[in-house]
Structures are given as structure tokens and as C-alpha cells.
Amino acid sequence: YGLGSANKDLPAFVVLLSKNTDPQAQPIYARLWGSSFLPSNHQGVKFRSGADPVLYLKDPTGDTPKGRRQLLDSLSELNQIRQAETGNPEINTRIAAYEMAHRMQMSVPDLTDLSKEPESTFKLYGEDARNPGSHAANCLLARRLCERGVRFIQLYHRGWDHHSNIPGRHPKITKETDQGSAALVMDL
């Protein structure tokens, strides 16, 4: 029950990393959303900060959805042949990832389109929610992911590891995170 997504078009585990606003912010490593002892299909899928959270949502110029489907089917056949030869379970994970990416081409644009959100939502989350990649926008996106059946959403906002100028830096970062975080908790 707890593993997998309730939505076949989105991953079960999504990572949202806010745009870096602090030049001294600590780095965030992908191992933080790895699958550890679980199969790799349970690792987190990082959505990029900004207006285009997932690359290649649109087919390349000259390609059609039918052509893309044929390409994926051919690639799947080749991967299945290789999997039969080697018995490597990671090949099945790769096939599933290609299929998920194809389905995400349809679901992510609707997910990230905030134009249908009422003005009251932006009052609740703050005006920064209109700025793709901001913490407030990621909180709103997390709510929308949750509504669509994504079971685990991890929000990262760097810059909390202050070792100097705490009175100068801490108010700035709390201003960036407080309203969006509170709105997300209220919405959930």
C-alpha cells in the first residue's frame, strides 16, 4: 500500500528544491532522495526549480506523439531482450522510467499550470508563489502533487546552516519560507 503512486502518471516520490537565494547555502546531494535498500524505482524524482520543472515535456520539432510512442515501444523491446539475457532488475526499472517520463509529458504541464488557482490561493501562499522555484511556489506545487496522489513530497530550502551573521541572515530566510509553509500545512 505505502509504496508506489496513487497516480500512474506521476512518480510516488517527488523532490522540490527551492531556488538558491543564499550564496553561502549548503549543497544538497541527490543521495538524500535515493532509494537506499529499496529498488531504484522508489527513488525520488527531482523537479527543477523554475518555470520548467521537468525537461523535455514537449516532443522535439518534427516528432509526433505517435512517433514518440513507437520509439518507446522499440526501446522497450530492446531493453526486454537485454533484461532476458542478463536478468538485471534495473533494466525493468529503466523501462518503467521511460514509460513514466512519457506519461509525465501529459500530466506535468497541467500540474504546474497555476493559472486556474484562485486569487485567494496566492493570498494564502504569498505573492512569491507566483515565482516558479520559490519556496512558496514549491509549497503550492506540493499541495497540487498531493491532490494528484503523489505519496511523498520532499521540500528543500537551503541556507539554514548559519555560522555567521545570524541576525542578518535568519530573518531573510524565515521570510522566504514561513508563509508558504504555513499555507501548505493549513491546506493539508
Model-derived features: positions:
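Ligand-binding pockets and gating/stacking loops
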Residues: 1-188
